Amino acid sequence: MMETNNENKEKLKLYTWDEVSKHNQKNDLWIIVDGKVYNITKWVPLHPGGEDILLLSAGRDATNLFESYHPMTDKHYSLIKQYEIGYISSYEHPKYVEKSEFYSTLKQRVRKHFQTSSQDPKVSVGVFTRMVLIYLFLFVTYYLSQFSTDRFWLNCIFAVLYGVANSLFGLHTMHDACHTAITHNPMTWKILGATFDLFAGASFYAWCHQHVIGHHLYTNVRNADPDLGQGEIDFRVVTPYQARSWYHKYQHIYAPILYGVYALKYRIQDHEIFTKKSNGAIRYSPISTIDTAIFILGKLVFIISRFILPLIYNHSFSHLICFFLISELVLGWYLAISFQVSHVVEDLQFMATPEIFDGADHPLPTTFNQDWAILQVKTTQDYAQDSVLSTFFSGGLNLQVIHHCFPTIAQDYYPQIVPILKEVCKEYNVTYHYKPTFTEAIKSHINYLYKMGNDPDYVRKPVNKND
């Protein structure tokens, strides 16, 4: 049997990541899983989860996406074997070498929880109730902020509420849709994602690349996680792999203020789908005609609804810009702070993949001798576990560790799973990072910014050194 396996392996071709990356479309779709290359083109129309998530994975190392997006079954491993065509000889991004029993144990116990409780991990009354209420809140606050009154200060208050409504829309409906965590219907995910373009004027397609392919697979990895930034000169230092400048000593003061422009920055940046065709180190897959149409329509609807219609209603241009900036700053602060208190805080782990290139200008990534799932725990912090308000207003991201280990499970179930996670962490001696309140979580973020900007013993680490 061993000889047969070796013979089969010799017959299979060896591919570089660059070769695999060219097969990234619906009619020619390859992926990498656990060092093996698969041509799953014939599986695309048959995939129960639809084609979009496969297209997102196309031409990439999808190992950890493949594992974390099928938490309730192991059938996908046997199914994919028939599409195996070769092995990978090089990697575009960090490779997580080790697979421990931690994640398999955690998945087994979570599966058992849903089986014994007869619950569907993607469906609950709360999911749809939240969705309806948030859409209603979004529409009502939009009307109030744009058309209900010409009183300046009242419009300012409504603009704040509209910013909050947009934040909740992003953290609940859009976020659930990008992770396929709401219903089992791919068309539902597509429609809900399109409403992000239409109502927020921001690209759902771009977000899925930044968040699902980038942040979730390479959490807190400098030069791979888009959320950390990648420029040599950055407005803040948050990893030990960055050069520190004199102004960073004040980053704990100015950085939280600048978080307010996060939403505006994202809306401007998402055009890179068509120009740079990458978000930092994360390549964009070729965009389809329908996704292009959604992108363009979303920008048009945004301009009409946020500028043209309010001007027709008789808002002055100066007042309109004021109301717009208020809602955008609220949205930016809300979202940015929600993300920062989970990953950019004290005691969490940061890593890097080096910007070293071979003769063909291909990056040579770091190999992480750790388990991907364990690193999700080491790079993430939870807070206010028992607070219903914190769970709602954060979109369940106060329980971020569970979300990273089980991104496809509806956020309503996170509180049920946390005790299981803590139990498994204790068994495997993995530290579970937790703060009792949101206040303590944000304090930890500010303290971390201060430390990184002011520590007199700070020495920049080489990007190929990962502790």
Curated annotation (Swiss-Prot):
Keywords: Electron transport, Fatty acid biosynthesis, Fatty acid metabolism, Heme, Iron, Lipid biosynthesis, Lipid metabolism, Membrane, Metal-binding, Oxidoreductase, Transmembrane, Transmembrane helix, Transport. The keyword Cell membrane does not apply. It is a multi-pass membrane protein. A motif (Histidine box-2) lies at residues 211-216. A motif (Histidine box-1) lies at residues 175-179. The chain crosses the membrane at residues 123-143, 152-172, 187-207, 293-313, 317-337. Its cofactor is Fe(2+). It catalyses: an (8Z,11Z,14Z)-icosatrienoyl-containing glycerolipid + 2 Fe(II)-[cytochrome b5] + O2 + 2 H(+) = (5Z,8Z,11Z,14Z)-eicosatetraenoyl-containing glycerolipid + 2 Fe(III)-[cytochrome b5] + 2 H2O; an (8Z,11Z,14Z,17Z)-eicosatetraenoyl-containing glycerolipid + 2 Fe(II)-[cytochrome b5] + O2 + 2 H(+) = a (5Z,8Z,11Z,14Z,17Z)-eicosapentaenoyl-containing glycerolipid + 2 Fe(III)-[cytochrome b5] + 2 H2O. Disruption phenotype: Mutants show no significant alteration in fatty acid composition or in phenotype. One of its GO terms (cellular component) is plasma membrane. The keyword Nucleus does not apply. Heme binds at H47, H70. The cytochrome b5 heme-binding domain acts as the direct electron donor to the active site of the desaturase, and does not require an external cytochrome. This is Acyl-lipid (8-3)-desaturase B. The gene is fadB.
